[in-house]
Structures are given as C-alpha cells and as structure tokens.
C-alpha cells in the first residue's frame, strides 16, 4: 500500500500499527514518567511530529503542544486543512513519528478528541501506554556524501499492494539500516511494511538485493531548501557478505573525512 502526500485516500490501513521489528521490544518504554518526559522534550525542542491517520492513507505534520501530568493526556496541533482535521477526529488511532537528537520516537494515540484553542484546531488524546524510543547508540550511523551518494531502489508490484519503483538517495547508513529522502510529490511508504524487492547500490560495489522494513517517516527540509520526508528503514535480512560490504563503505568514507580534516588529503 502506498501513502500519498496528498491527503484524501480513504483505504484502510492493513497493518498492525503497534508492530515492532524483531528485537526492538527492548526500546519500548512503558513508564509514564519517562513517556511524559520524552513528550515534553518534543515540546521543548519544537520537534516536528509526523502523524499517520488510521483509516486514511495520509501523513499530517503536527507538533506536541501540551502534556498534562494530572490527567495523563497529550495535546497535538491540528492541521490547516479542514479535511485532514475531520479525518483525524474520526480516526480510531493516530500513529506518530518524531526524532529527538537523531533518535527515533514512535507512539500511538487512541481516539483523538477535537479541541478549539482560540482560532486554532488541536486534538487531545490519552497519554500513550507505551512509547518506542530507538536508542541504538551501538550502531554508528554515517551521513553519506552529497556527491557520489549510495542509492536505494524500492520496488513493489500491484499484487503486493501497489506499483512502486523509486530510486532514492541514501542520506545515512549504518550496519542496521539506512535512511532515504522523499521529495514532495513522491508517494510515502507504508509504516512497518517490509518491501521485499529492494536494491542498495554503494559506490564501487556490486548491487545488494535485500528486503527493507519502514521504521520511521517524518517531515524534513532537504538540502535544496524544499520540504520532503526522511524515511528510516531497517535491514530485515541481509544476504551473505552484505554486512561486511556496508561496514567497509562506512569505514572508507569516515577515514577519508578524517583525513581531509587533518589535511592529509
């Protein structure tokens, strides 16, 4: 299933929005104090939250406005688009993505309630029971060079949920996954879906065929100043030798950067 940037498709999401990739349960927080603290950090850092609306294939940029510690609820900003606000109001749940200091955050809000705050629309929901906070500090993530970047091709046929053939720039990569950028007008990818027919092309290496699972998706400003989306994807099942190839690429680029900084090259 594809998720267009235009907000209007009414097809049902057919995935379990709370599904975590294998081994990710250790990053699931259930302590209310910790959850409130992270949501408050989203407010303090004015972080953009990308909200996926259940029952509609749409992604709406928003922000956390308030966290109530007494009644355990959270308030999120509404959209300037009336149709989007109606869809949010009617949703059974909202699946929200954000980043704090380059660490992915994901949480689910049940049955949002519409509020009118002055002239602005907002939505209140009960504090999430759990929050996914992916602190994979042990996995070094390399920001790829703007020139001679790796590319990732993501394909899907109609039988698997919709025709898709995207060749995207890889903006960062680690031994556990990669991130690609989607420009305005490109279809968004389905959260938590595994795309089986993908190809990673590293410079000076043979193409690597592999499946990729969508872990996060949020709005960002691209290097050219336009708005787009950053999509974080996990390596689901690397073929033999691929991990070593990726690690060699990361080491080589990192070594070249350090050499330039020290004036060696």
UniProtKB/Swiss-Prot annotation:
Coiled coil: none annotated. One of its GO terms (biological process) is bacterial-type flagellum-dependent cell motility. The keyword Nucleotide-binding applies. It comes from the Bacteria. GO terms for cellular component: bacterial-type flagellum basal body. Keywords: Bacterial flagellum, c-di-GMP, Nucleotide-binding. Residues 135-252 form the PilZ domain. One of its GO terms (molecular function) is cyclic-di-GMP binding. Its main location: other. It is found in: Bacterial flagellum basal body. Acts as a flagellar brake, regulating swimming and swarming in a bis-(3'-5') cyclic diguanylic acid (c-di-GMP)-dependent manner. Binds 1 c-di-GMP dimer per subunit. Increasing levels of c-di-GMP lead to decreased motility. Monomer. Interacts with the flagellar basal bodies. Belongs to the YcgR family. This is Flagellar brake protein YcgR.
